[in-house]
Amino acid sequence: MAELLYLKEAEQVVTVAGASDKPKVGEDLSEIGVIERGSVIVEGEKIAFAGTDADARHYLQKRSGKVKTIEATGKILTPGLVDPHTHLVFAGSREQELTMRLKGKSYMSILQAGGGILSTTKSTRAATADQLAHESRLRLDRFLQHGVTTVEAKSGYGLATDAELKQLRVAQQLNNDHPVDVVSTFMGAHAIPPEWKQDPNGFVQLVAEEMIPQVAAENLAEFCDVFCEEGVFTVAQSQYILEEGKKHGLKPKIHADELVSFGGAELAAKVGAVSADHLLKASPTGIEQMAEAGVIAVLLPGTAFFLMTEPANARAMIEAGVPVALSTDRNPGSSPTESLPFIMNLACLTMKMTPEEVLAASTINAAHAIGRAKDIGSIEAGKNADLVLFDAPNYQTLQYNYAVNRVDTVMKAGKIVVEGGVLLEKTDNQRCSLATEDRGTRPIWQK
């Protein structure tokens, strides 16, 4: 019989329960199921009980076997955070572009001059799979220290069949050997590479007719994404790629209406996309159609913050009944952060979402955006024991005390992987510092 873990008497247990079948929308987004002085009991990899501490003690009295107690007094307990939009696997860095943008260059002008995504593509193509895996593990380590237990990871920095497959194989490897679960998305249509600049339709055909079948044949991704944007992929090109993806079992996602109102939100509704992401310039009609179709809006306030632009109109989407999720958009050009808690801060401060809304958007709704809501995203009996203890007296403090990492303990599938804010090495359960590129070391993980 598995040892029971008793997370005892947290100041608050934020369950976000009751929305595993469909995401929270409208006023329900603020209903996050807070249990004051609550406790959670974990058995093996699953949550066995969540409720008041008095009820937890009664539950334990009826059980036999060993019980390990983790004192949670003075802390709050939430579901493991879920990041539904990252560009995790890449090589290189683009810090020089920050100075370019500060001097007036736009994101698209940098891209069209061969920088931006194309700069990262050059580095990623040149990197070996081992190099990509090493750099990406370090990013996952930092995600974990910020309370993120599941991430989505897109390809899109290969922009050639072999390089795209390389990225996706690395993501699959990381899912197998790192505590953070990695859910893969194929995004060969992230930009037009230089060799196809004079024949963009030819590249679209390559993505749809060569890349997608190979991705599906190797079962390397669950979703297909496309950058539907002026100067990148047209609505017609985007629809063709997404429909071809659907034929091969890849569920559609869209980078939509980030820079201009371009019809991406409307296309997301038309093709039945799981999510439309960015949406800074989404039209009122597009928002209405997304609500009717149940398309999740994955909002990325960190990208708007870093690019110094106005964020998406989260309030209009929530009031229209669009399910809203939050994400870091971790990437080297427009959102170089692994701190989903900081993104939650930005959602409050720049998009006027409430502390309750951002918690739901970063847990259960984010889980819906990657098809994992039946297993993660809330604290309910039978779900995976992905949990975070924050060193905070209440959940409001997480958004009030902004840009501070208050993660104390992270549990993944019933195993403690972060304690006292520090990663634990699974092989001997000894504390180790966060690996960095300079130290060249990392925790050894095996699922």
Curated annotation (Swiss-Prot):
What does UniProt list as this organism's lineage? Bacteria, Bacillati, Bacillota, Bacilli, Bacillales
Q: Does the keyword Cytoplasm apply?
A: yes
Cofactor binding notes:
Binds 1 zinc or iron ion per subunit.
Report the record's Gene Ontology biological process terms. Answer: L-histidine catabolic process to glutamate and formamide; L-histidine catabolic process to glutamate and formate
The family database entries (InterPro entries) matched by this protein are listed as: Amidohydro-rel (IPR006680), HutI (IPR005920), Metal-dep_hydrolase_composite (IPR011059), Metal_Hydrolase (IPR032466)
Q: Which residues cross the membrane?
A: none
List GO terms (cellular component aspect).
cytoplasm
Family from the record: Belongs to the metallo-dependent hydrolases superfamily. HutI family.
NCBIfam families in the cross-refs: hutI
> Which positions does UniProt annotate for Fe(3+) binding?
H85, H87, H255, D329
Name the SUPFAM superfamilies on file.
Composite domain of metallo-dependent hydrolases, Metallo-dependent hydrolases
Superkingdom is Bacteria
Q: What is its EC number?
A: 3.5.2.7
**UniProt cofactor(s):** Zn(2+); Fe(3+)
Where does the protein end up? Cytoplasm
Positions that bind 4-imidazolone-5-propanoate: R94, Y157, H190, E258, S334
Q: Describe the task this protein carries out.
A: Catalyzes the hydrolytic cleavage of the carbon-nitrogen bond in imidazolone-5-propanoate to yield N-formimidoyl-L-glutamate. It is the third step in the universal histidine degradation pathway.
Which of UniProt's keywords are assigned here?
Answer: Cytoplasm, Histidine metabolism, Hydrolase, Iron, Metal-binding, Zinc
Q: Which HAMAP family match?
A: HutI (MF_00372)
Q: Which residues bind N-formimidoyl-L-glutamate?
A: Y157, N331, G333
First-listed, main subcellular location of the protein, grouped into a coarse class: cytoplasm
Q: Does the keyword Cytoplasm apply?
A: yes
* Pathway annotation: Amino-acid degradation; L-histidine degradation into L-glutamate; N-formimidoyl-L-glutamate from L-histidine: step 3/3
Molecular function GO terms recorded: imidazolonepropionase activity; iron ion binding; zinc ion binding
Gene for this chain: hutI
What name appears for this protein in its UniProt entry? Answer: Imidazolonepropionase
Question: Which residues take part in binding Zn(2+)?
Answer: H85, H87, H255, D329
Pfam family membership, one: Amidohydro_1
